[in-house]
Amino acid sequence: MQAFTRLDGRAAPLSLANIDTDQIIPKQFLKTVEREGLAKGLFYDFRYDGEGNEIADFVLNRPEYKGASVLIAGDNFGCGSSREHAPWALMDYGIMCVISTSFADIFNNNCFNNGLLPVVLKPEEVAVLMDEAKGGNHMVSIDLAEQTVISPSGKSFHFDIDPVRKDKMLKGLDFIGETLMHGGDIDVYESKRALDRPWLEA
């Protein structure tokens, strides 16, 4: 998993509330366990019409938001069924941070487990970011170490984060990476077990 320390990037405002995981990545794109290539399905029913043509006024189709790495979202983002493909699709598109007033619990956990930073701010702070991102300057900065979001106009907003999750994000540690850190202890245990209980090795 890639470490997350600081992100300076373009922010796209998506003011809709209660965006569920089926809207983030529709079910027809869930037939793979590969993380790459899922960007094409991200917000598919918002981005394309019934004939597969881009819907010009959807935020991610607008030229000024192309290449956005931060999504400013409405309340209760990521609700609905559990699907790890949702953060995968966002990250494959290039979005590394989502800012909202709240996230569905399972989606929130899936984000942290995959290296996508979910940031919870107060409603009035999200409203400021939404407003400013709709202007001429769309650039924001997220500093995980300092736990701050800097708006396009320079306003600073503090966010809370579980210290254990923060540490893992800063170090780029997922479950596998965490386990590999204890590789030496695991090897010692397995060698000792092989001597003490050789019948288990048969």
Swiss-Prot record:
What name does UniProt use for this protein? Answer: 3-isopropylmalate dehydratase small subunit
SUPFAM superfamilies registered for this protein in UniProt: LeuD/IlvD-like
| GO MF terms, alphabetically ordered | 3-isopropylmalate dehydratase activity
- What organism does the record attribute this protein to? Caulobacter sp. (strain K31)
**Class of this enzyme:** lyase
Q: Domain of life here?
A: Bacteria
**A Pfam family per the record:** Aconitase_C
Question: What is the stated purpose of this protein?
Answer: Catalyzes the isomerization between 2-isopropylmalate and 3-isopropylmalate, via the formation of 2-isopropylmaleate.
Which UniProt keyword terms apply here?
A: Amino-acid biosynthesis, Branched-chain amino acid biosynthesis, Leucine biosynthesis, Lyase
Which biological pathway? Amino-acid biosynthesis; L-leucine biosynthesis; L-leucine from 3-methyl-2-oxobutanoate: step 2/4
Q: Which InterPro entries match?
A: 3-IsopropMal_deHydase_ssu, Aconitase/3IPM_dehydase_swvl, AconitaseA/IPMdHydase_ssu_swvl, IPMI_Swivel, LeuD
Describe the reaction catalysed, as an equation: (2R,3S)-3-isopropylmalate = (2S)-2-isopropylmalate
| Recorded family membership | Belongs to the LeuD family. LeuD type 1 subfamily.
